[in-house]
């Protein structure tokens, strides 16, 4: 099954490092880097507001466990956001391409 994984990162440098590693290692077929994200969250009892970037990672359920570990190894956050969402439907040719380029 195909998935979109959401990952927030603190900088463009970190975004590019993670994106390139995932695609080069065939853990993802494509990664979109979306700038201009404002995140408001609770951390260590305080409400924090940060500027971040969002990675939209296209991968498969099979590749996700290795992808998650690779992101954790590259990510500067203690508890990085790594959330996988299933793709219910999509362009069949795109989903075929995604599977062919992951794993």
Curated annotation (Swiss-Prot):
Any one GO MF annotation of this record: copper ion binding
Keywords: Cytoplasm
Any Pfam family: CutA1
UniProt cross-references to InterPro entries, sorted A to Z: Ion_tolerance_CutA (IPR004323), N-reg_PII-like_a/b (IPR011322), N-reg_PII/ATP_PRibTrfase_C (IPR015867)
Predominant location: cytoplasm
GO biological process: response to metal ion
Domain of life: Bacteria
Gene Ontology terms: cellular component: cytoplasm
Gene3D superfamilies in UniProt: 3.30.70.120
Subcellular location, record wording: Cytoplasm
Function in brief: Involved in resistance toward heavy metals.
Family the UniProt entry places it in: Belongs to the CutA family.
Subunit structure: Homotrimer.
Protein name as annotated: Divalent-cation tolerance protein CutA
Organism annotation: Thermus thermophilus (strain ATCC 27634 / DSM 579 / HB8)
Lineage, broadest ranks: Bacteria, Thermotogati, Deinococcota, Deinococci, Thermales
């Amino acid at each position: 099954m195909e998935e979109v994984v959401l990952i927030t990162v603190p900088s463009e440098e970190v975004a590019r490092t993670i994106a390139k590693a995932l695609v080069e290692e065939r853990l993802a077929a494509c990664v979109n880097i979306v700038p201009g994200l404002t995140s408001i969250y609770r951390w260590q009892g305080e409400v924090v507001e940060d500027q971040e970037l969002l990675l939209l990672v296209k991968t498969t359920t099979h590749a996700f466990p290795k992808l998650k570990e690779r992101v954790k190894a590259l990510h500067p956050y203690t508890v990085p956001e790594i959330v996988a969402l299933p793709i219910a439907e999509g362009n069949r040719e795109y989903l075929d391409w995604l599977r062919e380029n992951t794993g």
